[in-house]
Amino acid sequence: MAAVETRVCETDGCSSEAKLQCPTCIKLGIQGSYFCSQECFKGSWATHKLLHKKAKDEKAKREVSSWTVEGDINTDPWAGYRYTGKLRPHYPLMPTRPVPSYIQRPDYADHPLGMSESEQALKGTSQIKLLSSEDIEGMRLVCRLAREVLDIAAGLIKPGVTTEEIDHAVHLACIARNCYPSPLNYYNFPKSCCTSVNEVICHGIPDRRPLQEGDIVNVDITLYRNGYHGDLNETFFVGDVDEGARKLVQTTYECLMQAIDAVKPGVRYRELGNIIQKHAQANGFSVVRSYCGHGIHKLFHTAPNVPHYSKNKAVGVMKAGHVFTIEPMICEGGWQDETWPDGWTAVTRDGKRSAQFEHTLLVTDTGCEILTRRLDSAQPHFMSQF
């Protein structure tokens, strides 16, 4: 850290004289960022690093005028970035959509950095919340509504439709149900759902690229209602797809359901990864390691951490009243990933396709309840696309 003139430390609760400044902030032109010691700087890092992300995002926006575009769409907004596959972003993104003030909002909705202070307060803990009967009813409601919204998105998927159009429909469907779309502004995510096409593993940002015949696309939906989040996703075929896509999507769904079949009190969370990886590898696929399932209720992401790969070190044993997601991401090639310069879009490093399915689950006395299950059918949407 660089030495600076005498100032007061910016760590919450510290009024010591500050002699150091964050070197990254200096490079990015961020004013302030003074600390009294390395210890204070490290203690503030979880919050402070979000300033770096915001500054980089704003810099990228300022560079829009220098883009080379086809018509009004730019498919190469990050000069010099080497894409791992054929997919390209279609920028600029449409403006962030507003949520009416009468809809209850999570704590991060209006935070300038999209930070959830309630999640940060529990970061690092492995204690898993046991939900009360009131909590469980709240989760049942929001998960049912989230399922309704995903089913609406499913009906839109066909060649020529953009993921931006899907996001718009999702946003309106959330509002119509008096729900907040949980992804919106979560650590500054700019849209109301995630749409992940082909080599995108997860957290794809909806844009103006039309879906193409032969694509696969995952739509990830989370709603917030009465203080609770409900989370699910499915992968869909776009028109006719090749046999490799069919096998990948079918196997990914089987990985999820085999893991769900094992959920009951007394099972260690780390066992789920063994089940998922065994089935994926038996079919010639790999399991993403960077992204995991998670606890969910009044917090969007919390304990337990639920890895999908084998021999993981996840902490915790299932008990009746736990609620969490399982959401395996399965790849045609290697499991290694990287992230686009937008800071969100996770893609396979080798450019091969990835698929995902997710449910939110309640552990019961004898097994589990799939809170995000379809009510009109026992099977996911892709099975009706065969």
From Swiss-Prot:
Name by which UniProt lists this protein: Methionine aminopeptidase 1
Keywords: Acetylation, Aminopeptidase, Cytoplasm, Hydrolase, Metal-binding, Protease, Zinc, Zinc-finger
Domain of life of the organism encoding this protein: Eukaryota
Known EC number: 3.4.11.18
GO MF annotation, one: initiator methionyl aminopeptidase activity
Self-association state and partner proteins as the record states: Associates with the 60S ribosomal subunit of the 80S translational complex.
Location in or out of the cell: Cytoplasm
HAMAP family named in the record: MetAP_1
Organism: Bos taurus (Bovine)
Amino acids binding Zn(2+) 2: C22, C25, H48, H52
Cofactor(s) essential for the protein: Zn(2+); Co(2+); Mn(2+); Fe(2+)
Function in brief: Cotranslationally removes the N-terminal methionine from nascent proteins. The N-terminal methionine is often cleaved when the second residue in the primary sequence is small and uncharged (Met-Ala-, Cys, Gly, Pro, Ser, Thr, or Val).
Secretion signal span: none
GO BP, sorted A to Z: proteolysis
ZnF C6H2-type: positions: 6-59
Cofactor binding mode and count: Binds 2 divalent metal cations per subunit. Has a high-affinity and a low affinity metal-binding site. The true nature of the physiological cofactor is under debate. The enzyme is active with zinc, cobalt, manganese or divalent iron ions. Has high activity with zinc; zinc cofactor is transferred into the active site region by the ZNG1 zinc chaperone.
Annotated binding of a protein, by residue: H203, H301
Binding site for Zn(2+) 4: D231, H294, E327, E358
Family in the record: Belongs to the peptidase M24A family. Methionine aminopeptidase type 1 subfamily.
Record PTM N-acetylalanine, positions in chain: A2
Residues that, per the record, bind Zn(2+) 1: C9, C14, C36, C40
Residues noted as binding Zn(2+) 3 in the record, renumbered to the chain: D220, D231, E358
GO cellular component terms, A-Z: cytosol; cytosolic ribosome
Record field: catalytic activity: Release of N-terminal amino acids, preferentially methionine, from peptides and arylamides
NCBIfam families reported in the protein's UniProt record: met_pdase_I
